[in-house]
Amino acid sequence: MQFDVEKIKFLRNKTQAGIMDCQKALINSKGDIDQAIIFLRKQGIKKASEITGKILGEGLTNVIIDNNEAVLYELNSETDFVAKNKIFLDLLNLLGKILLKETKPNMNIDEILNLKFEDKKIKDLLLEKTAIVQEKICLRKVIKVIKKDDENFGMYKHQNGFISVLVITKNSKKDVSEDIAMHIAANKPKFINKEQVDLETLNQEKSIIEAQVNKELGNEKTFNIKEKIIEGRLNKFIQNICLIEQSFVKNPEQKLRDYLKEKEVEIINYWRLEVGERI
């Protein structure tokens, strides 16, 4: 059975499937375009589910803000080539709209993947795009945030989404919140201040520093001198991981806490996503 080129072309544009797949779908549906589209979708999902699970270390992050709500998320692919593909980028933007509207704070990824958009679950949408690009696409992280009326959002994206940051501040103008978000992207803090640093983190780092100092100095220095060196290095470690103790990225001579004091701004919370982090 032969079909005219225009019908195949229309089906390709509609589904982004290959020529041979479009021909097969038209044969199966006896030329019915709607049935051919259904056939291709079913075949695509079947193929996508068979694609083996490689480590998805590429992709993009994104952050979207709408009034008091924001969503931060990471969409992964196997290769950088697919992450730059229009199909992937369109999916990234579509997911942002869906996630901003449909998700709630503290939803787990399984709950999110089972959310429906136009009678289609998010996980099925991902499978469809996986079938088209012939490479697994995965929604790995989603963070939904709701702020209070008297708080401010700030956001920053580095390298078109390799890193995305969202920050909540109080008494802050837009440019100040964005500067703080940019600083977080660059300096990768783990806590806002010293008080948030947990005992497990401190003890783990202290044991590492103690081992380093003992190896470096051996029996050359007294216990008290070693303790002072260990204390100094531990304080330096705390400064490096605590946001407000870090040197401000736009003015390294100034601590971020001094910049915040100068601007009379308080940091409430922040979130930072980097592609492939902790995979």
Curated annotation (Swiss-Prot):
GO MF terms, alphabetically ordered: translation elongation factor activity
Pfam families membership: EF_TS (PF00889)
Domain of life per record: Bacteria
Region (Involved in Mg(2+) ion dislocation from EF-Tu): 79-82
Task performed by this protein: Associates with the EF-Tu.GDP complex and induces the exchange of GDP to GTP. It remains bound to the aminoacyl-tRNA.EF-Tu.GTP complex up to the GTP hydrolysis stage on the ribosome.
Cross-referenced HAMAP family: EF_Ts (MF_00050)
Annotated protein name in UniProt: Elongation factor Ts
Species for this entry: Phytoplasma mali (strain AT)
